[in-house]
Regions:
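The serine-hydrolase catalytic nucleophile loop
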Residues: 23-36, 190
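Conserved alpha/beta-hydrolase
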Residues: 36-58
C-alpha cells in the first residue's frame, strides 16, 4: 500500500469491530458513527476508516479498484485491528467484508452485512451500461444521495468482475447477521437471501426490515444494527469459551 489511510480507532475489549462503508462513501456516515458511539459506551474496540480516494484518505477516487479497496481493508486488519475482528459491511462494504474474510480466515471471526452487495458489478449494471464502460472507460450515474454524479470506471468494474463470489459456496464458518430493507431500491433484498444460502456457516440470520431503504439509518434501523452486532459478538465469545 503506497497511500495513507485516514482512520479512527477506539481501543476496547473483545474482537475489534471494523466498519466498511459503501461505494463512494466514507467513515463519517450515520451508521459508522452510531456504532462507534455504542462501542465507546460498551467499552468495545472499534475501527472506522476511509478507503483510498475517499473521505480524508490519500488517492484519487477515479484510480481506485475493488481489489485495491480490499487491500485497504486487509491493511487495516494487519496494522491497526491486529487481533480478531468482526466486520460490519454496508452495501459494497458487504462485498469487501466477504473478500477480507476469505483472505484472513483466522482473523475475521464474525460478519454483519447491511444491504450487502457482493457482485454488484454483475447484477447492478445493465448490459448497455457495461458496454458503455468498456467502450468509454467511465460511467456517471445520477446520485440520489448528493448533488454530484456517482462515477464508475472500467478498472473498478473489471476488478469487481474478477472478484465475484456468488457463483458457489461462500466459505465462512463464523456467525453472520444480514440486515436488509424491503424498500431498498438500490440492492434488492433477495440478494441477502441468496448470500445467506451460499454461506457455509450454520449460524446465519437474515433480517428483513419493513419499510427500510438502502441506507437503513433510521433510529430503529440503528438499534437493530447494534443488536445484530451484539448478537455476533456474543456468539463469537461463547464459541471461544472451552467446554468444561
Amino acid at each position: 500500500m503506497n497511500h495513507r489511510l485516514a482512520y479512527h480507532h477506539t481501543p476496547g475489549t473483545g474482537p475489534t469491530l471494523v466498519f466498511l462503508p459503501g461505494y463512494a462513501s466514507d467513515m463519517t456516515g450515520t451508521k459508522a458513527l452510531a456504532l462507534e458511539a455504542w462501542a465507546k459506551s460498551a467499552g468495545r474496540a472499534f475501527l472506522r476508516f476511509d478507503y483510498a480516494g475517499c473521505g480524508r484518505s490519500e488517492g484519487a477516487f477515479a484510480d481506485q479498484t475493488l481489489a485495491g479497496w480490499r487491500d485497504d481493508v486487509l491493511a487495516m486488519l494487519d496494522q491497526v485491528a491486529t487481533g480478531p475482528a468482526v466486520l460490519v459491511g454496508s452495501s459494497m462494504g458487504g462485498w469487501l467484508m466477504l473478500l477480507a474474510a476469505k483472505a484472513r480466515p483466522m482473523q475475521v471471526v464474525g460478519l454483519v452485512g447491511i444491504a450487502a452487495a457482493p457482485d454488484f458489478t454483475d447484477w447492478g449494471f445493465t448490459q448497455d451500461e457495461k458496454m458503455y464502460l468498456l467502450r468509454h472507460g467511465r460511467l456517471e450515474r445520477t446520485n440520489p444521495y448528493g448533488p454530484a454524479p456517482t462515477l464508475y470506471t472500467r478498472a473498478f468494474w473489471s476488478s469487481g468482475e474478477a472478484n465475484r463470489l456468488l457463483f458457489g459456496p461462500v466459505a465462512f464458518d463464523g456467525p453472520v447477521r444480514l440486515l436488509h430493507g424491503d424498500a431498498d431500491s438500490d440492492v434488492p433484498w433477495r440478494h441477502s437471501l441468496q448470500l445467506a444460502g451460499l454461506l457455509t456457516s450454520s449460524d446465519v440470520t437474515t433480517m428483513l426490515v419493513k419499510g427500510g431503504d438502502h441506507r437503513l439509518s433510521r433510529r430503529g434501523d440503528l438499534a437493530l444494527l447494534v443488536r445484530a452486532v451484539e448478537d455476533v459478538l456474543a456468539a463469537v465469545e461463547t464459541a471461544a469459551v472451552p467446554d468444561v
